[in-house]
Amino acid sequence: MDTAPASPEPFLVTPQAEVLEELIQAQMGPLPRLAAICRLKRLPSGGYSTTDDLHLVLERRRVANAKERERIKNLNRGFAKLKALVPFLPQSRKPSKVDILKGATEYIQILGCVLEEAKVSEKQSPEEQTHSGRPSDPHVSSTRELLGNATQPTSCASGLKKEEEGPWAYAGHSEPLYSYHQSTVPETRSYFTH
C-alpha cells in the first residue's frame, strides 16, 4: 500500500489585474476626458474641433498667470504700505491682512472724531476754549493724545476695547485684537405725541 502524502491545497490563481477605468467603461460606456482649455468650432458633422493652437493656449495661460502674480504682488505691496501707516497694530506678532484693515478702519474713525472735535472747538468762542482748559490748537493735542496713548479715552472715543471674549476673539493668536467703539449714544426721537 503505497500511500502518497496528501497534497497541499492548491494555491488560488490570482486573477488578472483589473483597472477601474476599464470596469467603469464596460458598465457605463466611454468616460469623459479632460481637455485643454481652448476655443472650439462646431463642425457640420456635429462634432467640435479646436480653433486654437495648443502653444497659443499655453502662452495665454502663462500670460494670465503672470498677470495674476503681479496683481497679488501689488496687493501685498499695498498692504505693506498701509501697515506702515497704521499705528494701532499688534506689535507682538505679524498682523494679518484682516488686522491691518481693522486697524486702518479704527484709525480713520479716530481721525474723523478728531476732525469733529476740531470743528466743534472752532465754533466755540475763545472764552469757552480757555475755560475748558484746552490748548489753542485742540485738534493737534487730541491727535497727539490718541497717537501717544491709544488706550486713553477722549471725549469722542471711549478708548480701544478688547473684542468680546470667546474662541473666535483672538483669531488663533494669543494677543487680542482691538476695536474702536464710540461712546456717543445715537439720538432717538419720539414720533408719537401724548
Swiss-Prot record:
Disruption phenotype: Females display a defect in the formation of primordial follicles leading to infertility. Although embryonic gonadogenesis appeared normal, primordial follicles were not formed at birth, and massive depletion of oocytes resulted in shrunken ovaries and female sterility. Null females do not express ZP1, ZP2 or ZP3. Since its expression is oocyte-specific in females, Figla is a plausible candidate gene for primary ovarian failure in otherwise phenotypically normal women. The gene for Figla null males have normal fertility. It comes from the Eukaryota. Its main location: nucleus. Residues 121-163 are annotated as: Disordered. Pfam families: HLH. The keyword Transcription regulation applies. Expressed only in the oocytes within the ovary and at lower level in the testis. Found in the resting oocytes of the primordial follicle cells, at the periphery of the ovary and in the hilar region. Also detected in growing oocytes, but at lower levels. CDD domains: bHLH_TS_FIGLA (cd11422). Heterodimer with TCF3/isoform E12. Germ-line specific transcription factor implicated in postnatal oocyte-specific gene expression. Plays a key regulatory role in the expression of multiple oocyte-specific genes, including those that initiate folliculogenesis and those that encode the zona pellucida (ZP1, ZP2 and ZP3) required for fertilization and early embryonic survival. Essential for oocytes to survive and form primordial follicles. The persistence of FIGLA in adult females suggests that it may regulate additional pathways that are essential for normal ovarian development. This is Factor in the germline alpha. It comes from Mus musculus (Mouse).
